[in-house]
Amino acid sequence: MKPSVILYKALPDDLLQRLQEHFTVHQVANLSPQTVEQNAAIFAEAEGLLGSNENVDAALLEKMPKLRATSTISVGYDNFDVDALTARKILLMHTPTVLTETVADTLMALVLSTARRVVEVAERVKAGEWTASIGPDWYGTDVHHKTLGIVGMGRIGMALAQRAQFGFNMPILYNARRHHKEAEERFNARYCDLDTLLQESDFVCLILPLTDETHHLFGAEQFAKMKSSAIFINAGRGPVVDENALIAALQKGEIHAAGLDVFEQEPLSVDSPLLSMANVVAVPHIGSATHETRYGMAACAVDNLIDALQGKVEKNCVNPHVAD
């Protein structure tokens, strides 16, 4: 008899078929308490869980006594109670490598669109404001040869550094938990403390996961240390930034502009002051949102669940020690 798994995110037909070759698959719309209650017997028997954008906490795990592995279609897993999973010896799988290049593309797009005011001036053209030769009020700022500060030199940080160094001749500063020898050798990146990075960078790109240590890592103190001409980019996790402090820094002119793919609350409220600022490019968490990459992430998550329930945790496992 095939193991039972719960799928709470739609999959392409071929990937659903692959999953069904290994498991009895039960599809649900979400992991809300109402859904769990209505499908209590299914949740009680499930050995696997696959999906994204839902919280997996201790309360849910209490309803799933046979759960052995959960697979998220994402690289981030801050919506999972890792301690609760680990305490119950439940494997947590994620998709860390598939989206690297695509998210780096998004970061570079935010750098370019904020610096060159692409969104703002495009809207002005559509509004009929381009009636003569443009003047300084249409101008942006250069990207090439400007200093890029990267906070978080992981896979995505490395991919961004490659684009910035080889594509735009940008000097690279970085701050991370440890020195990154490859970044220093390939991109001539210079490790520095966070204060130095903030003071010297023309663009500050934040690429950090959300943890207890990184929550509100960027606040009023950090923005005050940046150049008034600096542009802030965040495509990591929204709550790493104190959004009210960011809004205040933009309103006071402490920083020049911001390109944001993530926010403290998502979707972003239509009443957010960020949406009324011409110097803010706000996009709806599109970091990995291409057809190719989202398919690749889903395929990776399917394979991860198959591997996990077969005891294979050599890659893409957040807590592999629980399999010991």
Swiss-Prot record:
Record-linked SUPFAM superfamilies: Formate/glycerate dehydrogenase catalytic domain-like, NAD(P)-binding Rossmann-fold domains
Cell location: Cytoplasm
GO cellular component, one term: cytosol
Primary location recorded for the protein, binned into one broad class: cytoplasm
Reaction equations catalysed: glycolate + NADP(+) = glyoxylate + NADPH + H(+); (R)-glycerate + NAD(+) = 3-hydroxypyruvate + NADH + H(+); (R)-glycerate + NADP(+) = 3-hydroxypyruvate + NADPH + H(+)
Any Pfam family the entry gives: 2-Hacid_dh
GO MF entry, a single one: hydroxypyruvate reductase (NADPH) activity
EC number per UniProt: 1.1.1.79, 1.1.1.81
Catalytic residue list: 237, 266, 285 (proton donor)
Enzyme class, UniProt record, top EC level: oxidoreductase
Keyword terms: Cytoplasm, NAD, NADP, Oxidoreductase
Subunit structure: Homodimer.
NCBIfam families: PRK15409.1 (NF011938)
Family the UniProt entry places it in: Belongs to the D-isomer specific 2-hydroxyacid dehydrogenase family. GhrB subfamily.
Function, as annotated: Catalyzes the NADPH-dependent reduction of glyoxylate and hydroxypyruvate into glycolate and glycerate, respectively.
Name listed for the protein in its UniProt record: Glyoxylate/hydroxypyruvate reductase B
Species whose genome carries this gene: Escherichia coli (strain SMS-3-5 / SECEC)
